[in-house]
Curated annotation (Swiss-Prot):
Role noted for this protein: Endonuclease IV plays a role in DNA repair. It cleaves phosphodiester bonds at apurinic or apyrimidinic (AP) sites, generating a 3'-hydroxyl group and a 5'-terminal sugar phosphate.
Entry's Gene Ontology BP terms: base-excision repair
Annotated EC: 3.1.21.2
Residues at which Zn(2+) 2 binds: H36, E81
Catalysis performed (reactions): Endonucleolytic cleavage to 5'-phosphooligonucleotide end-products
Similarity comment text for this entry: Belongs to the AP endonuclease 2 family.
Annotated organism of origin: Thermotoga neapolitana
The protein's name in its UniProt record: Probable endonuclease 4
Gene expressing this chain: nfo
Cofactor(s) the protein requires to work: Zn(2+)
């Protein structure tokens, strides 16, 4: 959500490549220690940073599938940062695995 709301279109391969390249050039991917994982209530570039449950916002399942497909992203721990309590969080974790399976994403 943070990057997406800032204008990085992580729903497209080119957008993820651009974001990863910028991170590498600014401070190095090896220094990126975690990713907050959540969908966005608002469209790309809205600069509002309002979180939504996985697959229920403007990033959507297909967008997450693109993002999850990058090995660089897979190597960094993901911290779920979605609205709700334990039950909703468990459903969101399940949704992440469903997206990985549905889109046949190879995971290291």
């Amino acid at each position: 959500c943070h990057g997406f709301d800032s204008g990085y279109d992580i729903t497209k391969k080119e957008g993820v490549e651009s974001l990863l390249s910028e991170i590498e050039n600014l401070f190095g991917l090896e220094r990126l220690k975690m990713i907050h994982l959540n969908d966005s209530k608002y469209p790309l570039g809205a600069a509002k940073d309002r979180h939504e449950r996985i697959g229920s916002g403007f990033i959507g399942e297909a967008g997450f599938a693109v993002f999850f497909s990058f090995k660089e992203v897979q190597r960094i721990p993901w911290i779920l940062e979605t609205p709700g309590g334990n039950e909703e969080h468990a459903e969101d974790i399940k949704k992440v695995f469903e997206i990985i399976e549905k889109y046949r994403i190879e995971v290291d």
